[in-house]
Amino acid sequence: MDQWSDNKDAIGMLSESLKEKVVTNEIAPALKEVKNHKYNFETEILNTGNVWNNDSKNGESGSAFGLDKIFQSSDSGNIAEGLELDLGNIMLETHNLESPAWKHADYDGVAASVNDNNNDWKFFVFDEREIDSMLQLFVRDFRADKPALRLAPSKLFYLASRFAFFYMPKEKELGTVLLNAFLCEVNQVTQQHPNDMVLCVQWLANVSLLLFYLKKDNKLDDLTVDIQNRCSELMNSLYITICQDAMRRMNENLEEGMVKYTGIQGLEDILRSRSWNLLRRRPTNDASTSPRSTPSASPRSITKIIASTLHLLEVFYIHPLIRAQCIEQLFSWLGARLFNIVISNKKYLSRAAAMETRFNISSLEEWSQTNSPKLQKPFDYPDEDLKVDLISKLLSLVQLLQWLQCLYRLSEDEDPRALQETLESLDALNPRQIYTAAKLYRPDITETKVSKTFLKKLDAFHEEKLREKINSSDKGDVSYEFELLKDETVFSPLKLPTKAQLINAYSYIVSGNGFNEDRKIVFQPHVSNILIDKLEENGLSMERAELPTSVFEDELQRREWRPDQEVEELLST
């Protein structure tokens, strides 16, 4: 991550870059005209005509992505418990988006959310000596204590970068320095708090929105190619951090909740009948030995963490494509982790234990079926085979459990045809995994040990498949395809949204897609009065910012400069 520290020295030198400010009587009125010049940001810069439509059909509102449905959910308390969060800290109150307060941007309940001078600010004018203070206020110490502030940093630094690129001396490259500093600080803050999922999701949302602004700004798109690449890299890093945090939370209770938990009546005695330590005296209170006596370790505790993660991604308006990949990654990890737990522990390799684990896995399948509509991927994604299929991530685990439930009967029946058909149907398992499960199989109370003859048949099947693989493979070593355990550390590469998909989600002109009505308020780039108040409370003031004198190269250019003409030229396509 050395690239994120490249700008550390530059950030520290910003406060020393200017010793004095020159404010002329002629520049100040010009600045005022620039501030007050009116234009429609979405029309001039974010023109989004003829983009694709995804989430709604026949005029449906697509409210699944709206705040109303999210905030009115009856499971908010469960979500807080699943992630050990106080959801009050991220302001999950319900708002009526059709109310006059929201339509007039008075949704913070205190003051108008956009600056009084102009509802669509095109620049944020600042002094380069104040960059470090801006980073301190809106990155290092920033917490979104109001819903209106969740995406405020990306808006502030985007509008500030427009001023830096268009009005600051080009030789200083202040726009590039500013955005690099912003991304560098975000990376450092999230690395220092990898277990704070709210913080990481918040910055993933802001970096995503910044990437959208830069791609849609015709003037900045070509100037910020390297910045956009850094945004993509940081988004990938944050995506991994968020997934790893959710995995860590699930892993704490995964074995207790998904493998040991007994939800089927009558299986507890069978599971205990073949206990490892038969000489140890059992507790007199049978209830104390049952995982059912610990409600914190149950299949529901796992699905709550997944639901909580998805809920946070929705609350912070993470792009639907990224949301889907995040949940898919969690299911992929769950499938691999549970598979390894079962196959590497002999006490779980029994018919009764497999039945119980399979019953618990059904809670994951039920959750995926219920929530799949929330995870629809954009249909125009170039990969045609990119589909949301969470259940397939558990296929190897499910087939292992099926094999454990039927292998003893197959060994007793001695039917070669039935055995061959069964082995061929277990296409998600390799022969080594099939053989190991049978070899370590623990008979239930009514069963006997698996015969050696049956194991020899499985061993022959293993060797035959290995020879076929070697003969058909160009590479000599194919042993990696016959590994016993699944790789739990594999992360699928994050597929970032295309420009059209970003427009579909974040542009408030598009109808009926992405985040629906919320976009009309949430995604407009502006600097709210709340942010300006924070600046002034910390000694920064809009009145102290100024256009640099280098904008006017000589007296003639100074006399002929017209703000409206300048802005029109800058925003021309």
Curated annotation (Swiss-Prot):
Superkingdom, taxonomy of origin: Eukaryota
Record's keyword terms, sorted: Cytoplasm, Golgi apparatus
A molecular function (GO) term: GTPase binding
Cellular localization per UniProt: Cytoplasm; Golgi apparatus
Assigned GO CC terms: cytoplasm; Golgi apparatus
A Pfam family matched in the record: DIL
Domain Dilute: 180-464
InterPro entries named among the record's database cross-references: Dilute_dom, Myo5p-like_CBD_DIL, Vascular_dev_regulator
Keyword Cytoplasm among UniProt keywords: yes
Disulfide partners: none
PANTHER family the UniProt entry points to: DILUTE DOMAIN-CONTAINING PROTEIN, DILUTE DOMAIN-CONTAINING PROTEIN YPR089W
Protein name, as recorded: Dilute domain-containing protein SPAC25B8.08
